Amino acid sequence: MALQTREARTLAEKVWDDHVVVSGRNEAPDLIYIDLHLVHEVTSPQAFDGLRLAGRPVRRPDLTIATEDHNVPTVDIDKPIADPVSRTQVETLRRNCAEFGIRLHPMGDVEQGIVHVVGPQLGLTQPGMTIVCGDSHTSTHGAFGALAMGIGTSEVEHVLATQTLPLRPFKTMAVNVDGRLPAGVSAKDIILALIAKIGTGGGQGHVIEYRGSAIESLSMEGRMTICNMSIEAGARAGMVAPDETTYEYLRNRPHAPTGAQWDAALGYWQQLRTDPGAVFDTEVHLDAAELSPFVTWGTNPGQGVPLCATVPDPELIGDDGERQAAEKALAYMDLEPGKAMRDIAVDAVFVGSCTNGRIEDLRVVAEVLRGRKVAPGVRMLIVPGSMRVRAQAEKEGLGEVFTVAGAEWRQAGCSMCLGMNPDQLAPGERCAATSNRNFEGRQGKGGRTHLVSPAVAAATAVRGTLSAPADLN
């Protein structure tokens, strides 16, 4: 069925319809054109091998951009990568990009960084686009009104070869967040509260559109944080309709349109809103005024509670599967039911990742750390999401604030978000992290992760236990 027959359409449906090359028939998928393909060193080697074996070129190298992020160290970046597997992946990406004519921002380059930070800051990410990457958190780019999703390695090869992807239409979900956020509550708290409410499978098969006055009041950085973690709710993608905040963020970015092209683009972008009367498959509501700083206690992003709460008791969970999962999580996290979240001591604090490694996040952290010290026995890593973010932070004097406080101010990369580089937890170490996943071993074998906002991360580093800035007064 041709999707263009719909009258009142959601934002996701509009972007989808604009990119259908061939409509699927008899339950076949639609063939969707891809506007931007982001590539990194981990999920691309086999895709390039497939092209090489088939004798195929990259169809649109001009719509493909690569950066090194997952495996790169965040110190001594002028030296060879020590780990042989990481070194091989980075060197392979460099060879593949050179062979196939793909733009690459390597380690040390002024535009190097996490792929989901680099795309937006360069103005490559724009409203109405379809964007893919061999990475779960590609949904970040949906903050601009783009339909952005993570894909597997075989799909990476398909996009490299054809600039298209066969996809079946997704269901749609509206997450309405209305009201005024209380002081000290951020976008990270919104998304953690949502995932706790609907669960890690609540958005399965859906594209989530985040709507409402609280979402509209967020900066682009805040919107990216929320869309970034859509996948942790099981969703295929997350989106926010573009508005003046979006346009101002994009204006004068290196790859943003200019002059008459800007005017034409703006005319299209302004149509990218869900039509009155459009029907979502699912709707969820959150009252922003009732939210507070949020933190996870378990081993998936849905196992979270307000910071002011206590570790939940699995015996009070009715569902057998959820109860068993909670028991297993508490055993791994070495936590007892009833313990106040604010009494949980940490060994490390990590600020960074594609969730919270942007300049706005670093400003929040600096505001908390200024005039204070990281608690004895706590190691704090602050890792900018890109070299451009690092340069801006240095220009604003934030780097000095971090180092004077006793934090480690690093170079750009994925860092301690995942155990694919030297920045890892030791077994049994507990970390408050601004990243997006708290799975067992995510930050290193045996490491224990609590997901938090940048403000909570900074306060936790100072106090030594899970804390909000208000706890420091």
Swiss-Prot record:
The keyword Lyase applies. Gene3D superfamilies: Aconitase, domain 3. The gene is leuC. Heterodimer of LeuC and LeuD. Binds 1 [4Fe-4S] cluster per subunit. Coiled coil: none annotated. Catalyzes the isomerization between 2-isopropylmalate and 3-isopropylmalate, via the formation of 2-isopropylmaleate. [4Fe-4S] cluster binds at residues 354, 414, 417. One of its GO terms (biological process) is L-leucine biosynthetic process. Belongs to the aconitase/IPM isomerase family. LeuC type 1 subfamily. This is 3-isopropylmalate dehydratase large subunit. GO terms for molecular function: 3-isopropylmalate dehydratase activity; 4 iron, 4 sulfur cluster binding; metal ion binding. Pathway: Amino-acid biosynthesis; L-leucine biosynthesis; L-leucine from 3-methyl-2-oxobutanoate: step 2/4. PANTHER family: 3-ISOPROPYLMALATE DEHYDRATASE, HOMOACONITASE, MITOCHONDRIAL-RELATED. SUPFAM superfamilies: Aconitase iron-sulfur domain. Its EC number is 4.2.1.33. It is an enzyme of class 4 (lyase). Its cofactor is [4Fe-4S] cluster. InterPro entries: 3-IsopropMal_deHydase_lsu (IPR004430), Acnase/IPM_dHydase_lsu_aba_1/3 (IPR015931), Acoase/IPM_deHydtase_lsu_aba (IPR001030), Aconitase_4Fe-4S_BS (IPR018136), Aconitase_4Fe-4S_dom (IPR036008), IPM_dehydratase_rel_enz (IPR050067), IPMI_cat (IPR033941). Keywords: 4Fe-4S, Amino-acid biosynthesis, Branched-chain amino acid biosynthesis, Iron, Iron-sulfur, Leucine biosynthesis, Lyase, Metal-binding. It catalyses: (2R,3S)-3-isopropylmalate = (2S)-2-isopropylmalate. It comes from Mycobacterium marinum (strain ATCC BAA-535 / M).
